[in-house]
């Protein structure tokens, strides 16, 4: 049998938190070939090394499995689906999908992060043109996930600057699960007409001139809170997420998961998407309804999306203004 075609699932029952067995037929295929363990790629994109042990006649995922189970908050009756994506040198790699007891993919599994890793990415302009390079450090502990490059949830917030300002340093985690903190210089002003405007990390690289050009293209109601996103690959691909800036969510959204209605200017169609509130640092859109919004509005990497929370609406509603670039100029997309 072609090893690369192997797929199997395991239902989390019994003492699953400390180890799970590999199906007998799968274990027979790998007999004598797996000496270094399995590499498990989780929905977050991270890869975990998990050792194998033979107990009686069973092949058990053991060393490192407990860490994997804790990080992904595995519970009784969760279902894990394993798909082989390569093998060799005494190990085998699997993509792992994780479903809860209701049959839905577990959203929390998109947010696992590694504490001993960091990344740095420099941009020279809007549209994802990379000016620098990635920097990463990784622990030698193979039972923990590898460094995650390009994580969609490493985001920070900032406010647009104008008028007379003062600087207030505040601390914010670079990663929802990271023990390392950094200081963000945040500008505050009483006479700033954009005081309620927040920017995700990549949107924060927009220059003042670019921001002025972008906001000149849209009509925003005074007093409505706003956050700005520059779409990355992670936002528009299936099974990925869009993180809502932490400060915006804390100030303007309920501290629980709920539906939010998305509308586009001058269009009758409406989209109800799920807003997930998972912890004090992780909030965002992720589900098939968000993917439907992306697809039906033909959103692309590099688009600038301005999310305007409509005050006074009967239910949580955001108007989404989309800006693209043509001939090196920003244009409003219908």
UniProtKB/Swiss-Prot annotation:
It is found in: Nucleus. GO terms for cellular component: nucleus. It holds the Pfam family B3. Residues 142-178 are annotated as: Disordered. Coiled coil: none annotated. InterPro entries: B3_DNA-bd (IPR003340), DNA-bd_pseudobarrel_sf (IPR015300), REM16-like (IPR044837). One of its GO terms (molecular function) is DNA binding. Residues 154-166 have a biased composition (Low complexity). This is B3 domain-containing protein LOC_Os12g40090.
């Amino acid at each position: 049998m072609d090893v690369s075609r192997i797929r199997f699932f395991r239902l989390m029952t019994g003492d699953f938190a400390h180890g799970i067995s590999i199906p007998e037929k799968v274990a027979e295929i790998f007999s004598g070939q797996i000496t270094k363990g399995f590499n498990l790629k989780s929905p977050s994109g991270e890869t975990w090394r998990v050792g194998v042990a033979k107990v009686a006649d069973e092949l058990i995922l053991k060393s490192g499995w407990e860490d994997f189970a804790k990080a992904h908050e595995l519970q009784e009756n969760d279902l894990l689906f394993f798909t082989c994506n390569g093998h060799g040198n005494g190990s085998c790699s699997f993509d792992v999908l994780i479903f809860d007891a209701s049959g839905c993919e577990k959203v929390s599994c998109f947010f696992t992060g590694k504490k001993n890793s960091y990344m740095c990415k420099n941009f020279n302009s809007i549209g994802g043109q990379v000016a620098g390079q990635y920097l990463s450090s990784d622990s030698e502990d193979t039972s923990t996930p590898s460094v995650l490059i390009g994580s969609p949830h490493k985001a920070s917030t900032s406010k647009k600057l104008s008028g007379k300002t003062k600087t207030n340093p505040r601390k914010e985690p670079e990663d929802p699960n990271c023990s390392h903190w950094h200081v963000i210089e945040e500008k505050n002003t009483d006479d700033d007409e954009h005081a309620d405007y927040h920017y995700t990390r990549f949107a924060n690289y927009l220059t003042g001139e670019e921001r002025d050009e972008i906001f000149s293209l849209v009509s925003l109601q005074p007093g409505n809170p706003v956050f700005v996103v520059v779409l990355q690959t992670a936002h528009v691909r299936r099974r990925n997420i869009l993180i809502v800036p932490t400060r915006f969510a804390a100030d303007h959204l309920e501290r629980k998961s709920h539906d939010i209605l998305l509308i586009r200017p001058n269009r009758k169609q409406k989209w109800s998407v799920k807003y997930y509130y998972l912890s004090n640092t992780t909030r965002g859109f992720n589900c098939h309804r968000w993917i439907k919004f992306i697809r039906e509005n033909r959103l692309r990497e590099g688009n600038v999306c301005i999310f305007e929370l409509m005050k006074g609406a009967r239910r949580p509603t955001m108007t989404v203004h989309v800006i693209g670039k043509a001939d090196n100029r920003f244009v409003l997309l219908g």
